[in-house]
Design a protein with these regions (language model features):
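Acidic, glycine-rich catalytic/binding loops that coordinate metals and/or anionic ligands
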Residues: 4-9, 14, 103-109, 116, ...
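Short glycine/threonine/proline-enriched tight-turn/helix- or strand-capping micro-motif at secondary-structure
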Residues: 18-52, 61-63
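Residue-level detector of beta-strand face positions
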Residues: 41, 49, 78-80, 136
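Short alpha-helix capping/helix-loop boundary micro-motifs
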Residues: 43-44, 94, 99-102
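Solvent-exposed coil/turn segments that connect beta secondary-structure elements
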Residues: 47, 82-84, 138-141
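Short, well-structured beta-strand-loop connectors
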Residues: 49-60, 102-117
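Zn2+-dependent peptidoglycan hydrolase active-site motif and core
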Residues: 52-98, 128-132
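Short hydrophobic beta/alpha edge segments that flank linear recognition/processing sites
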Residues: 76-79, 109-125
Length: 177
């Protein structure tokens, strides 16, 4: 699938400060490795607009509310892009959003509004404690299924090699000639 090719990428928020989990952080329950986080959690006030990092096509946009017992994404958007150097597809993922402004199949440009960071303990936030954006970059195969926010050791539907440090990916992409 050929998606639009962004000439440059931008960060999804003007203030990119990781206030929650960061990419690759190992999450433990007691002393047991429970999972590895697959993106950056950027803590910002609820209502902060979230924008697309580059030209692309929306491949997923929906509300996955979950519950207070089984948390989920809330509002999630996944955008497909074509890398300008490798010509390979990659995907930007934005989770815990309210007021989604895009639909599947829509072609969007850099900076296009996707939604806003949702309030804590709401369906749009997926019932998480702190309002934040989960931002991730996925370079694996698109199978038209929801992508996870973390990788558990016993999970085999994703691989760590398919996930990139999102801030480093954006920075490196913009330095390539």
């Amino acid at each position: 699938m050929a998606y639009p090719t962004p000439p440059q990428l931008s960060l999804p928020l003007p203030a990119y400060e990781i206030g929650g989990y960061h990419f690759g952080q190992r999450l433990r329950r007691r002393i047991i490795l429970w999972a590895t986080h697959l993106g950056d959690d950027i803590v910002q006030p609820a209502g902060t607009p979230v924008n697309a990092i580059g030209d692309g096509e929306v491949v997923w946009a929906e509300m996955r509310a979950g519950s207070a017992i089984k948390r989920n994404w809330g509002g999630i958007v996944v955008v497909g892009h074509t890398h300008r150097v490798t010509q390979e597809p990659f995907y930007s993922l934005y989770g815990h959003l309210r007021d989604l402004t895009v639909t599947v199949g829509q072609t969007i440009g850099t900076g296009h509004p996707l939604g806003a960071i949702a309030e804590s303990y709401t369906a749009a936030n997926g019932w998480w404690k702190i309002p934040h954006l989960h931002f991730a970059i996925y370079t694996g195969p698109w199978r038209n299924i929801i992508l996870p926010g973390y990788k558990r050791p016993e999970q085999f539907r994703t691989k760590m090699a398919w996930w990139q440090d999102p801030h480093a990916f954006v920075t490196k992409y913009n330095q390539l000639s």
